[in-house]
Every structure is written in structure tokens, then in C-alpha cells.
Regions:
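The serine-hydrolase catalytic nucleophile loop
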Residues: 80-92, 106
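Alpha/beta-hydrolase active-site loop
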Residues: 119-140
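Alpha/beta-hydrolase fold nucleophile elbow
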Residues: 141-153
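Glycine-rich "HGGG/HGxG" loop immediately N-terminal to the catalytic nucleophile
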Residues: 85, 108-120
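Conserved alpha/beta-hydrolase
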Residues: 93-113
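N-terminal cap/lid segment of alpha/beta-hydrolase-fold proteins
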Residues: 28-68
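Short beta-strand element of the alpha/beta-hydrolase
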Residues: 68-78
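Bacterial N-terminal signal peptides
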Residues: 8-19
Length: 156
């Protein structure tokens, strides 16, 4: 009798906890490893490098963007990292400080294209940053004469 009561409680607790967990997961579309800032707007973007590989990034823009054009920064993380990790955090932080920023997955990594997967090439990484700078230079609100890059770890 006690076993059945305990089992019923465990099943009920599991259902309640599982239900709440699923509701929370559905309520949030934030896919990053860091907290979302209320100071920036984020837009998913795609662009190609000169080899035709499609790169995917998150464009971060200050919510209180002034009328004048802003400086911009392209950001990418170390080998194997994706924009939902450190590069996204750096980009979000700098956007909160008045920059338009682009955190992107390098070729062969994350949502970006390229085969084989999970390889690194200094030449391709250079082209990826060049493509990111080109992409930023034609965005509304970006001062094309004031674009920099942040390469984290091995990409620095």
C-alpha cells in the first residue's frame, strides 16, 4: 500500500515537473549560452564568402540607436565554437555599448555551410572575416569607415 502511494506521488511529481519544463522550453526561443540583454535587438542573417560558402550570423543592434551611423564589429569564436557562445556574448555586450555587431559561425561550423564539417583553415577564416566586414559595410546604420573585428582565441 505504501509502495503504491509513493509510486503515485513520484509519477505525479514527474508529470508536473515535466509539464513545467516543457512549457518553459516552449516559452523561450533564446538559444544562447548567455543571458539575453534588453538593450539590443537581434536579427538572424546570412551572407556568403568569396568561395560561395553561406555563413550564418546574428546581427546585434543597440535598441536606442542614434540617427547617425554607428561603428561596427564582426566577431567569431575559437575553433569549434558557435555564435551562441562567446562570440555572441561579445557581440551582445559591444552592441549594448553602441556598436552594431555581427557574431557569425565560421565556415564548416554551426549553422554555416561548408564540407567537411568541423575543420579549420586560417585562409578560410580570413575570408570569413572579410565577408563579414563586407556584409556589415552595406547595412543601414553602419559607418563603413569604422568596422573592426574581434577574433576570440585562435581566431584573434
Amino acid at each position: 500500500m505504501k509502495f503504491k502511494a509513493v509510486l503515485n506521488i513520484l509519477v505525479l511529481a514527474t508529470l508536473i515537473t515535466g509539464g513545467n519544463f516543457m512549457n518553459n522550453a516552449k516559452a523561450s526561443d533564446w538559444d544562447k549560452t548567455f543571458a539575453k540583454s534588453d538593450k539590443v535587438n537581434i536579427e538572424k542573417v546570412k551572407f556568403k564568402n568569396r568561395y560561395g560558402i553561406e555563413l550564418v550570423g546574428d546581427l546585434y543592434m543597440p535598441k536606442d540607436k542614434p540617427a547617425e551611423k554607428l561603428p561596427a564589429i564582426a566577431v567569431s569564436g575559437p575553433f569549434g565554437a558557435v555564435k551562441e557562445q562567446a562570440s555572441g556574448l561579445y557581440a551582445q555586450t559591444m552592441a549594448g555599448r553602441g556598436f552594431i555587431t555581427l557574431a557569425f559561425d565560421p565556415s564548416y561550423t554551426g549553422e554555416s555551410g561548408g564540407e567537411p564539417r568541423l575543420v579549420a583553415s586560417p585562409d578560410i577564416n580570413t575570408e570569413d572575416f572579410s565577408a563579414a566586414v563586407d556584409f556589415l559595410s552595406v547595412q543601414d546604420g553602419v559607418d563603413a569607415d569604422k568596422i573592426g573585428i574581434i577574433g576570440i582565441c585562435g581566431f584573434g
